[in-house]
């Protein structure tokens, strides 16, 4: 397993959870972003900076994916591509994207996008709260525990 983080929009508090988890579980993790960011010194954590542009980071993640890799993203199309390529996708609120729920998520995203383009103010997601952080940490821990048992 390799953890791929869509790091441009990933909240700092989630990155901190990921840094600790990668180190503890001894799992390779790469943050992919189009701007520089600080990462802790660790043999398990890497940073890949890509050029600016629409979906450049997403495309780079998809290109490098292997079966059973884990992708951390709130980007539903990236999550769908990851799942299609045999990876696991988890969003920063701790929700696991699956083959069963990704189609509905894509449809809702497209519907909201069409509302926004017609001038409707749909607002954004609520701020990340403690419950979201805990759900993320719990699901990440479950996935890493399952991976450790399979090694």
From Swiss-Prot:
Matches recorded under Pfam families: DUF188 (PF02639)
Region ranges (Disordered): 116-135
Matching InterPro entries: UPF0178
NCBIfam families in alphabetical order: PRK00124.1
Similarity comment text for this entry: Belongs to the UPF0178 family.
Protein name: UPF0178 protein Tcr_1995
């Amino acid at each position: 397993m390799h953890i791929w983080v869509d790091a441009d929009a990933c909240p700092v508090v989630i990155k901190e959870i990921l840094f600790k988890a990668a180190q503890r579980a001894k799992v390779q993790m790469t943050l992919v972003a189009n701007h520089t960011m600080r990462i802790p010194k660790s043999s398990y954590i890497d940073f890949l900076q890509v050029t600016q542009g629409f979906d450049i980071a997403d495309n780079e993640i998809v290109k490098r994916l292997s079966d059973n890799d884990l992708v951390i993203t709130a980007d539903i199309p990236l999550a769908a591509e990851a799942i299609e390529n045999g990876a696991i996708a988890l969003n920063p609120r701790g929700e696991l994207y699956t083959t069963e729920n990704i189609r509905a998520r894509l449809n809702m995203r497209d519907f909201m996008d069409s509302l926004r383009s017609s001038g409707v103010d749909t607002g954004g997601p609520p701020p990340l709260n403690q419950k979201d952080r805990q759900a993320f940490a719990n699901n990440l821990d479950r996935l890493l525990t399952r991976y450790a048992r399979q090694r």
